[in-house]
Amino acid sequence: METLDLSRRGVLLNDEQLGPYPLEKLKRVERLTVDIVEDSPRVDEKEMAFAKCRLGGFGDVLKKRMEDFTVRVPIGASYYHFQKYLNDYPENEVAPEKAPLPEDTRIVTRHIKKMAYFTGAEMVGVCEVPRDVYYATKVDGTPVERVYRYAVVFLVRTQLPTIAASHGDEWLDDTVAYQAYQRLACMSNTLADYIRRLGWPARSDAFNNYVTIMPRLVALAGLGEFSRLGIVVNPFMGAAFKAAAVLTDLPLVPDGPIDFGLQNYCSVCKICAEQCPMHAISTGEQEEYRGYMLWRTDERRCVAHGAANPHGCTCGRCAKVCPFTRSEEH
């Protein structure tokens, strides 16, 4: 009996939309839409704003406030603690024999994306991971020595009805963030476990367990562009999303960055800067920051408000008022 060539019939490889958002309609470009200094050095995780604040880099008062950061509200604390246990879940070993996967890496890539959507992801992209995207060391000083070639990056929407009911910088913002982080930790650990069972190394890269600078992965995987907010904005979700990834050596096909005109848009739209309670968002031009040409955010002002916020903790006013976020509020 003749073997049915499923890939030729378009069952395993086709152009059908995988998730709820039409990513195939986006304009793909060869490079990110911001200029990059190619030889930018790897940075230590302790240099990230919230880690620096927790370690006392912004003073003892803010360091003290960080002791109960994210756990001041019962529901936020519940999400935070369970998400932490997911990160600490022991990894299974990589299977000693590799599964007989198709030789066409496009088929494998599409399958892995489908699995990511199956776990609950709302948007998925793939990229190669430059070495400078990996941290040099973790917060505790442990070197990040193991690097992987590819990243499967996925996003989930933060809950829009809750964001719409919030003014952006009270306890609700923290809760919707950790609700998303918990889901992402479950998804990324599940997908990494699955890939290891196929015989390929893989690890979850989720909040509180990152070894990469996640916004860069999101942009490289074609899931957004760098914005005036200082974070990545997605053309469908705006800034109301959270991200995680699975890092792996399983050969995959990268998607490539996107260009939906955000650099021009952000150059004239300054709503986020106008609405920022601490005036931490730049109203000026882009400048070099850690090897990238970006709109600089005053990290100390931003984190200080989040850590010492009398209404809760963290702040998401900029993400709430971004026009790309608000487009789906109703």
PLM regions and their residue ranges:
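Iron-sulfur (Fe-S) cluster-binding modules
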Residues: 1-124, 147-148, 320, 324, ...
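Catalytic cores of enzyme domains
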Residues: 113-114, 118-329
